[in-house]
């Protein structure tokens, strides 16, 4: 199965294309969609949507996995995160792809073994698990962790533990 | 000037196409984009985006005006509202249209004369101001109020009072 993992944020969205199953996986592509502050919010969201569409056209993933939002400092942040999350959801729906959401805490628990792992620990573990020759940027590592959790969830017991839901 | 006004929400997005200037306006089209609960969130957002694109293609507005989010009960609501707001922003940016945001309170103050006006009062006043033969659905009336405020804001003094900002 081929999965597109997304860790969305208005100015810095991590993405990853992973192929494999619940026991093994390899990274085909990963990176960070960076939008400079001079671009207004509407243009930034459109750019994330277009980038996601391009990734889907190029890599033809079977499904999409995205990080759920659990904790936010303020309503302002929540609104901005909700908007950033909408852009890849729209791109996925345009291609008729199903999107699954995972709690960031459960993804970290599954991948690093600790729900409170920090960004460096996730990047370090992802590098080891996928045999990458470099430590990935942390937003891309988060996207790979989500995609990896989604591949693990092809085992139904893991899907329950990971508390996944369709969005 | 022709303006597309949008009052976004995941399941019920009001829209309005108004033409005019700061002193007079008429409604060319208005309505509510309703998405049934059986459609997942990603499909709902995609549908709002596509509907907005269709409206832009049909009516060719010069600018887009959208309601800002001021008060929300919970982070969950804020995330959902942020997502709903992203869909028309993406559609507008795809056509290179500038989007202006207005505070709902200031729009009500400008149109009804009272920042705390309820939905019925807005719909009643919009019907009178635009000479409509029916009382519009409240979500459509909100979108017309935003579009009307935007036309008023073509007078720079009004733009300042309305506290508008580009998004």
Q: What label would you give each PLM region?
A:
Chain A
Residues 1-167:
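Phosphate- and other anionic-substrate recognition elements at nucleic-acid/protein interfaces
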